[in-house]
């Protein structure tokens, strides 16, 4: 396993949301997102100085809501040996999407829609000179366009259900290692056409989490799709699973990295903001720019966290708490919920060429 050293400050430096460590009422640590919030709020945030006034009333562990910089935040606190850890997450009710962002998403949906309409019209025309090969090409482009639209709609629907609280958590004991192996196997079966190699490395035996199969599966596909796009033709994508333990805390760490050139810090700064999105992370992006937003919500829903780092290449890390599987009944095996549609082609439709969408015999 690569040593990414994601524990401690290294993890929180990469966290896209404000994190502050307080010790005896003073600021002991803060990350870049906390510094940006302090600047917007007009606070003074420096190490070894008193906490900003709005945060001084926070005491003990738990969850509460705060109004900071004119926005509603969910504040989660945890008592550590080094002090009180304060993690801030913008409340979904405070997230507003500007009209220009909606226009951008509509434009991205218009591309596959236009392609779908165009090839459908060509197929509807009676052309005695059209070869069987050309007809098959049109049908493949038609299928790719439809799958791309379906993927976009699935992303919006899932993100909406997680943001407004109308979907209760229904986790079951699930073998994350088995789920990752299944998804990677399916991805490998179509990645030759994409010109990218994908591999999975596991270390640590059984990796049981209390999870929702469909959401974790959707998160995996989004992260792999991002990595394939970043790696480019002839690139390499690697997933690593590792069981971790620190005192009484047990968790599984999933790290995904690619052979691409990485991202600029200013690109990552907006990657988790629904109002801006990650569409600008790649010139080849054909999605809505909401994939990382969705993945982060899924990780947090499962009691975990997600971070994206960049250097020589992009690295995405997800940590999820482990369970023993005994307190939750029978082990839940990964299931196919695609309803007859090739789920892998849907989830990777924005990075696979049209040749991958030929009708299976």
Question: Can you name each region flagged by the protein language model?
Answer:
Residues 263-276:
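Short conserved segment of the HATPase_c
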Residues 284-294:
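Glycine-rich phosphate-binding loop
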């Amino acid at each position: 396993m690569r040593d990414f050293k994601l524990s401690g400050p290294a993890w929180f430096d990469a966290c896209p949301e404000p994190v502050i460590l307080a010790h005896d009422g003073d600021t002991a640590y803060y990350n870049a997102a906390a510094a940006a919030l302090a600047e917007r709020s007009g606070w003074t945030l420096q190490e070894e100085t008193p906490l900003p006034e709005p945060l001084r009333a926070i005491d003990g562990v738990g969850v509460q809501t705060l109004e900071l910089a004119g926005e509603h935040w969910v504040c989660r606190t945890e008592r550590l040996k080094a002090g009180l850890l304060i993690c801030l997450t913008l409340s979904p009710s405070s997230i507003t999407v500007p009209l220009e962002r909606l226009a951008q998403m509509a434009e991205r949906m218009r591309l596959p829609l236009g392609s779908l309409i165009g090839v459908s019209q060509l197929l509807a025309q009676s052309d005695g000179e059209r070869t069987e090969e050309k007809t098959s090409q049109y049908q493949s482009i038609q299928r790719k366009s439809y799958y791309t639209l379906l993927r976009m709609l699935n992303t919006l629907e899932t993100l909406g259900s997680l943001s407004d609280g109308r979907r209760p958590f229904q986790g079951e004991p699930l073998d994350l290692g088995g789920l990752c192996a299944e998804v990677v196997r399916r991805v490998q079966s179509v990645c030759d056409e994409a010109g990218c190699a994908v591999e999975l490395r596991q270390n640590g035996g059984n990796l049981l989490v209390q999870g929702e199969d469909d959401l974790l599966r959707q998160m995996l596909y989004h992260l792999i799709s991002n990595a394939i796009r970043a790696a480019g033709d002839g690139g390499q994508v690697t997933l690593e699973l590792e069981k971790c333990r620190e005192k009484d805390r047990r968790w599984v760490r999933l790290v995904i990295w690619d052979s691409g050139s990485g991202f600029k810090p200013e690109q990552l700064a907006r990657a988790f903001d629904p109002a801006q999105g990650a569409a600008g992370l790649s010139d080849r992006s054909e999605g809505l720019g909401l994939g990382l937003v969705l993945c982060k919500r899924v990780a947090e829903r499962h009691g975990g966290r997600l971070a994206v780092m960049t250097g020589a290449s992009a690295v995405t890390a997800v940590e999820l708490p482990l369970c023993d599987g005994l307190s939750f009944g029978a082990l839940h095996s990964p299931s196919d919920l695609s309803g007859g549609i090739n789920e892998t082609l849907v989830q990777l439709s924005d990075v696979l060429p049209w040749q991958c969408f030929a009708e299976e015999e």
